[in-house]
Amino acid sequence: MTTAALASEVAAQEIETKQDRLNALMDEHGWSAVLFSRHENIAWITAGRVEARVALGTETAVCSLLLTRQGRRFYIAPENEGPRLAAEEFSGLGFEPLLYPWTDNTTDVLAHKAGGPEIGADTAMPGFYHHNFTPLRAPLLSAEVDRLRQVAAAVTASTVRVLRTFTPGITEDEMAARISADLLTRHITPSVLLMGADERIFHYKHAVPRAGVLKNYGMLNLCARQHGLVISITRFIHFGPLPAVLAANFEKAARINAELLHATRAGATSADLYAVAAKGYAAAGVPDEIAKHHQGGACGYLERDWVALPDGTERVAPTQAFAWNPSLQGAKAEDTVLLRDGAIEILTATPDLPVIEISIGGKIYRSAGVYLP
């Protein structure tokens, strides 16, 4: 068996397992089929094999996937997309094409004809039952964990490699360009680029690249996607001695991060984790900081599947990815981690950069410090 054939067989097995989850959901709601149009769900159900983006900023793909309770699978697309989708995306995955002229989008008609009258959908469409499929994507399967680790390792390596190239005088736009180029040449797509220089890091939680020029302090904060899986990481660089106040803030952020990691256990709710963060900020003497930015949460096929909220009801799954991002006054801790077998694995660890270690309950949790070249 060729490598490509083996990969298709492994993907097909993963798809079958996920089809079982879909079948249970369809039985629960009385649906005859499910229609996926959102990127995260298309990537999930196709084992990360299908990249159906043309416009990078859209939430929906150039095709929709119809999966029936009887086990048939279709991709619905305009005729002009058909050849590429057949050759480069769906080959070997067991999906049948349903094509329409690009001048007349009949996705709804084709879906009902092939899937029946009662269809759940991940986008709001007349004649379909709109549903949030996020809970279906957890827990992660072993193959997904393997891919997540691979993507995280590549994104982390790019982050460290590019961070080390920053020097005083670099612009925020150039910072974004360098990390983007490094990722894209490895077939990894950046989805969030937050590059801050000096005072902008203190003023804005989401420092999108603007006219800033690095003097002493720089932030490289990104999310990047491959195989449908999204990795989040933030790292900082400082030229000259690190101010004591900033160093203290990184220690505080690292402690809040450690407390969140320690509390990230199967069954914990979004509200439980928000309370942990709130308590951490209060203990750090900055109780109001939690109101200035979200604290992160579960991730996987989106930058965040959900964030911790005071009244959040989502629950942590036994095998799930998370990206917490506690921050205060110029400092932030952010890594992508995996909860598996009751333990936390930091997927974006950077041991060659400064590390802050926090001990909680006999366990050591590590966050990144500031790189001082």
Question: What name fits each language-model region?
Answer:
Residues 1-373:
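Active-site neighborhoods and metal-handling regions in enzymes and metal-associated proteins
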